[in-house]
């Protein structure tokens, strides 16, 4: 539970910083997958967005999240299309995709953990009322940002997890060795409850 706006601001700032780093790493993994499937320009775009998001840290805002979300969705749709159309993947492609899958699962689990902290902060501030001048500028800023950016972060995490699990399952049908995703499914259930 959150006891003050000052605490909420600190928790949210830390969560945004962690989230920006995690999402940046996830975007780089998606770029690696795109690369393995010869989607070079899409991979380059995602890497640029990942670098931008990583540099933002706790200054990340909704527009940054929207941009990387749009680019990730477009690239993931192309990845999905390429995988479905592929009759056979080369051994190099299978190795690259398998490595990406192995990197993806634990990173997504930690991203869900960050989203859980965000969810706790979002629900914790509902009982705090409005911050006052004595709470400080960071608290006043957090009071404006938490109700909008917090749910966007949670939604992005849920959508990314569902897309990722779907892509891993598709990779598996193409002979790529992928890790078990049951932990992701159960953590996603916790996040959405």
Predicted segments, located by residue:
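Immediate post-signal-peptide N-terminus of mature secreted/exported proteins
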Residues: 1-62, 185-193
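Extended amphipathic alpha-helical interaction segments
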Residues: 63-191
């Amino acid at each position: 539970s959150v006891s003050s706006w000052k605490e909420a601001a600190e928790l949210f700032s830390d969560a945004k910083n962690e989230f920006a780093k995690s999402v940046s790493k996830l975007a780089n993994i998606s770029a690696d997958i795109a690369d393995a499937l010869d989607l070079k320009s899409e991979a380059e775009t995602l890497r640029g967005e990942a670098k931008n998001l990583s540099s933002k840290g706790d200054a990340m805002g909704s527009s940054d999240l929207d941009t990387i979300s749009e680019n990730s969705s477009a690239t993931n749709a192309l990845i999905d299309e390429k995988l479905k159309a592929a009759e056979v993947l080369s051994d190099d492609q299978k190795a690259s995709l398998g490595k990406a899958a192995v990197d993806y699962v634990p990173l997504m689990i930690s991203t869900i953990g960050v989203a859980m902290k965000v969810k706790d902060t979002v629900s914790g501030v509902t009982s705090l009322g409005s911050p006052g001048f004595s709470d400080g500028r960071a608290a006043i800023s957090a009071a404006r940002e938490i109700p909008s950016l917090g749910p966007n972060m949670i939604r992005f995490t849920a959508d990314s997890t569902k897309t990722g699990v779907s892509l891993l399952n598709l990779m598996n049908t193409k002979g790529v060795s992928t890790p078990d995703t049951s932990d992701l499914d159960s953590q996603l259930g916790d996040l959405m409850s």
